[in-house]
Amino acid sequence: MAPYAPTDGISKLAIDQSKHFTEALKEALKSSADQQKVAAEKVSELVAGDANLNLGVVSQELRNALTGNDADAKVVAAHVVDDLMQKHAERVEAYLLPLLSVFLDLLGDKKPTVRPVAQEAALTIISSANKNSTIRILPILFDGLDRSKKWQTKKGALDLIAELSKVAPYQVGRCLPDIIPQVTDCMWDTRKEVKVAARDTMTKVCNVVGNMDIEPFIPALVSCLANPTEVPECTHKLASTTFVKTVEAPALAIMEPLLKRALAEGKTAVKRQAAVIIDNMCKLMDDPAEAQLFIPKLLPGLKKVIETQADPECREVATRAHETLFVAGGSMEVSEDELKVDYANIHKVVVESIAANPTAVKANIDSFVVDYVTGICYFLVVSRNFNKAVFEKEITTYIKAFMKPEEIKPLANEIRDRCFKENKSIFIEDVDCDEGIPDLCNCEFSLAYGGMILLNNARLRLKRGHRYGLCGPNGCGKSTLMRAISNGQLEGFPSRDELKTVFVEHNLQASEAELSVVDFILVDEDLKNTPRKEVEDTLAGVGFTAEMQAQGVGTLSGGWKMKLELARAMLQKADILLLDEPTNHLDVKNVAWLENYLTSLTNVTSIMVSHDSGFLDTVCTNIIHYETRKLKIYKGNLSKFVEQKPEAKAYYELESENVKFIFPEPGFLADIKNKGKPIIRLTNCSYQYPGTPKPSINNISVTCALSSRIAVLGPNGAGKSTLIKMLTGEVEPTSGQVWKHPSMRFAYVAQHAFHHIESHLDETANQYIQWRFQSGEDKELLAKETRKLSKEEKEHYKKPVNWEGEKRVLEEIVSRRKFKKSFEYELKWEKCPVDDNAWVPREKCEKWGWDKLLQIADDREAARANLQARPPTAIAVQKHLDCFGLGAEFGTHSRMRGLSGGQKVKVVLAAAMWLNPHILVLDEPTNYLDRDSLGALASAIKEFNGGVVMITHHNEFSSALTQETWNVEAGFLVIEGQQAEDKTKIEQKNEEEVTDAFGNVTKTKIKRKLTRKEKKAKDKARKEAEARGEYYSDSDEE
């Protein structure tokens, strides 16, 4: 038997049987302009009413009319196609779709009457055709974008692609890898109309991806395609986004052009960032077949970075991305040709399946339908749609004109079985939850933040009335997960209309600082209609007196601000309460109140992040734990969780094997022979804030030494932070004296630690530290009150002083040097040459009243000494950041805006320690750090050879580290447990290595102090050399 072949062309019999249609069409083509549409509708009705009419003849006759020279005939034929596709698309689309290319050419027709009807007919074909025929439509539209085509044709094709993205978004999404290059080329067209249309079309086709994470960046991505210079900035923007959806082929297709360009950028940082994004997006891809589509497109760029990039760290990241992409693609490296679905093979499957079915052979299915069905099957293969019902429905729609529906099913199954493989299923482990208690949510999602994959196909199931402790290491995404819930970014999580979710975090803004406490709550959009009495009663319930409710928000301490946030959340009557470090800034009494309040909420679910193990033990009914990018729920509180998972004992122990902080050695202090000798002293000091009726601090006297380990305790608002600010020089006492060693340096981490970096969030940690210390001085130190000169002080320093019998006016203090057991300072006088500079003892300068200027000079000299030993180069700064658990991924290559709260605190701590300080002052150091990091901090404090002063409500932390306690109550100080004087001898230590900006490492030579005998021999050698008339240098001895 001869092999089956579909009817190709039109037989003479078919033409004879269709003569009545041909005659009717010829008659319609002759109609006047005002009757053309009516005549076209009659022809359309004739086609619809004749089931035996050969539609191949219809297609051919319409093509002849559209390609002829008669403009009126073109208009009528276009109206016929438009009417048929609107009313009878299923029957005629296989025959009329090929005419789309003719309509594209007619968009540039010379006759103005032809162009609009051609546009209308083309739009109708696009909107009425089967959505799965998109893969057949697109090649026709791409042909219309060819450079040889008229600009009207190009613009029309672009408009049709945009329309296609509206009517068939899923199908367009699957075809994005083919669409984006074609439209991108048109963005560089010489014709303005084409460029504008291309940009608009690109935006619309990118929006079909339906990925809420990428949608905000689509304008930037589109702009990058037209302006490659924007690639670096766009890469940085995308690196700081939060991903909450599994990455599918359409999402990666949008990103691919940017990533390819970023990998080819000249800047190492951009290449590295692109590699990180590839690494993390591919980790979120579940289907290896989808990842394989991008292996031939992205792998070559990664290989080039690995082979040619000079920076070893960048090569390492690119290697990791290469491996992730390779694994995501099923550990197979395939070429682009191997991944293409062969249309000819699909056509062969359809033809052979028909040939194997006797009924189908007798049906004599024509080539128009075979080609159309092949196109639909081709798309189903490309999109890996394995649904039998869909497959059967699609084939039946077009073959039912030749066969009975019951005869088509075996044929459809045969075609389907030969085209598709079995779909792989993904097993998702469910979590252990209590049955019988209502679910608030049960959803599955993925989550990423910046350059890190946080969760992949994780399931979250929450029960009403349960209290969940969210546990995991710093940077794993605890706060990010809660923020994603609050912002409605999690797939399947109920909307805020169904489930009231309130996020309580440390983000109280100072812009409303003048509002009273009550008014601050009432301006909230969700609470503006709440009765004032209810607000006042709620505030009273958390401890706000009537007097406190009337005062400004800006006057509240950190603890009271957090209680205000909690009160606001209570008033919103949440179903789910999201608490980010709720015990931060709260004293013991208020922590107990919070525990009682949360446990009393039997109908409200709470999710909380806290590093206070006692709090989690008291409050939690369940623990949600991060495990290999999944969430696992354990029954019971923290102690029960640790019983089930012993490796989590770090939540109880203030020691860490996973994380280690290394504090730098304090700089050498002249005349300080042992660690117990005071290096700062406050005597009878008081401080009163402007406009307040009484002092915050009253008549205190304290000292600190290198051996000090001091805890500052007291209730919220007692004056602890004010005492610390006075100690560090952020404020000057209104009465009393402050003395400190001229070369002493402080490291100060404030209660609201982020204020140190809030104006630098678009920089990396490395860049921030380089900026802060690039001049050798700490730019934050320059902003302190003790460094600012008042008008009266400036006038005082301009008063003449008597020096060597002359009246002199100081211009500046230039430098400092050792003088006996003190210092002397080089003074530059006004209107005098440099040669007249004078070296004046410190005591003399103090007598003239220049204490503040001396302090400024001392700080500057101390900073300069550190700059010479350790210049703030990128390599040196990253080495320093490594000592605080912040690797290059987050320290050098990620902007601080994308870091977690704990990582930001590490940045602040590392920056504070850059100048090798002698005293470390920590205001609430346990805020935002996880247990591992707290353990690392505790170990570093124990090993630190400088003094430590800390404010903390974390009793476990302070009791393990301190021997002396300063109890502050209502502005008065009581000192307990003063430690014995440490007489440990101090030895000067120097940096063993210095790394310059080019990465060159220089070994430093440490000079040993000469013995008396060696000094005498050195003096004798010098005198002998001078007697011989020779120059003598110390280097001659080396």
UniProtKB/Swiss-Prot annotation:
Stretches the record annotates as Disordered: 1012-1038
One of the entry's Gene Ontology molecular-function terms is: ATP hydrolysis activity
Provide GO CC annotations from the record: cytoplasm
Q: For this protein, what reaction is catalysed?
A: ATP + H2O = ADP + phosphate + H(+)
Which controlled-vocabulary keywords does the entry list? Answer: ATP-binding, Cytoplasm, Elongation factor, Hydrolase, Nucleotide-binding, Protein biosynthesis, Repeat, RNA-binding
Q: Where in the cell is it found?
A: Cytoplasm
Q: Mention one GO biological process in which this protein takes part, according to its record.
A: cytoplasmic translation
Instruction: Give every ABC transporter domain span.
Output: 426-654, 680-995
Major place of residence = cytoplasm
* HEAT repeat copies, ranges: 93-131, 133-170, 174-211, 213-249, 255-287, 292-331
Q: How does it assemble?
A: Monomer.
Identification of the protein by name = Elongation factor 3
Q: Which organism is it from?
A: Phytophthora infestans (strain T30-4)
